[in-house]
UniProtKB/Swiss-Prot annotation:
Keyword terms of this UniProt record: DNA-binding, Transcription, Transcription regulation
Ranges annotated as DNA-binding: 21-40
Alphabetized GO MF terms: DNA binding; DNA-binding transcription factor activity
Domain HTH cro/C1-type: 10-64
Coiled-coil positions: none
This protein's name: Uncharacterized HTH-type transcriptional regulator YazB
Pfam families: HTH_3
InterPro entries xrefs: Bact_TransReg_Diox, Cro/C1-type_HTH, Lambda_DNA-bd_dom_sf
Gene Ontology annotations of biological process type: regulation of DNA-templated transcription
SS bond partners: none
Length: 69
């Protein structure tokens, strides 16, 4: 469940900032297949990937994080 929420948020911010999966994966230094797994919620992103994604998207990791209930 948590992986799905992270994946949806990463995908939404990626699209909002105009990145393709290929371009975003390259900027993160990961494969497109790993990014796809994360975005589909099949893989929980590591703390390093979360921070790298936030840096590439020019947002804070807190903004990228799912809201707490």
């Amino acid at each position: 469940m948590e992986a799905e929420i992270w994946g949806r948020r990463i995908r939404a911010f990626r699209k909002l900032k105009g990145y393709t999966q290929e371009g975003f994966a390259k900027a993160l230094g990961i494969s497109v297949s790993i990014l796809g797994e994360i975005e589909r919620g099949n893989r929980l992103p590591s703390a390093a990937i979360i921070q790298d994604a936030a840096d590439v998207l020019n947002i804070s990791a807190d903004e990228l994080a799912p809201p707490e209930k």
